[in-house]
Amino acid sequence: LTKNTMQRTFCSVIGCLKNMIYKKIMINNFGLDAFVVNNFKHVKLWQLMLPFLVLILFFLFFLFSEETNFVDAYVESQKGLFLSMNSTLAAYPNIQLNITELGDVFVIFPLIIVFLFYAPKLWEVLLTSSLITLILAAVLKKYFYVPRPAHVYDIDSFIIIGKTHLGNKSFPSGHSMTIFVVIILLLFAFMPKKKSYTIVWSLLMLLAGFSIAFSRVAVGAHYPFDVVIGIALGFIAAIIGIRVNNNVRWLVWIKNKRFYPGFMLLLIIWIALIILKIIDHNLPIFYLSLMSLVGTLFLITRAYAKQN
């Protein structure tokens, strides 16, 4: 009798778990966009204080620097820090080579492309924030014209993983800006309600963001301050993107299934581009992007076919 009671109790628990999981799946499938919209409504402008403080302190530091030339002061002031971080982080070259690719829109966007189908609001904000990031990066890189580490330091003095980046477009790091736009949007979009979960979620997301951003130092492509300012600017672009889309719904057409054929064509082109990347470099991270693109193409195609 006791054994039968235990079995019934166990089955009841399993049944409850199944119902909870089923309800969770149903919420994810049909209410995820509403969940994201509601979370974005709680994002406030005061949350820009920290990244703006970072920017102010950064420019004050160089404003009162003894060097008259910003570029010279910028490069020399962090040489020791760059060499130290590069040496430490480059201890895992294969990992760094893969995760640094996550700062590339052609690689990171496919990994979250499925939310175009399940949470289009996230993509409305992502496109707005990405446009802001693109403009900021282009203007600042051209204005400051800071040479890359490999253009200034002896290339035998530090570790370069993958491609050797030259030229004068080091500041700020575009990869860091991109990844932090994505990280901050995901952070707020899927912020849990419980405080304990919120803390864990925030720490995990920020840890992932910092790890990816500072991989740019590990591969020898950027100075540490390039990354720090890139992070701050990405944070700012994400918050502004959220606030803009809370008030101006200029990309609301994204969720309209009439435009699915255009998205399907875009996904096919994107798949081809990722395949070319795989042919050229064959990194595992590219396969994850490819699988995500193929899966999303299947979902959107099926949804469009059912509608028609």
Protein language model regions, located:
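Extreme N-terminal basic, low-complexity initiation segments
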Residues: 2-8, 12
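N-terminal transmembrane-helix/juxtamembrane module of multi-pass inner/ER membrane proteins
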Residues: 10-107, 141-166, 304-308
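Juxtamembrane/transmembrane-helix boundary motifs in multi-pass membrane proteins
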Residues: 39-46, 88-92, 116-121, 125, ...
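Alpha-helical transmembrane segments
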Residues: 48-59, 131-133, 206-207, 264-267
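Hydrophobic alpha-helical transmembrane segments
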Residues: 100-119, 175-185
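Interfacial segments of alpha-helical transmembrane regions
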Residues: 112-136, 201-202
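Hydrophobic alpha-helical transmembrane segments of integral membrane proteins
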Residues: 124-153, 212-220, 224-227
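Membrane-embedded catalytic cores of phosphoryl/pyrophosphoryl-handling enzymes
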Residues: 159-306
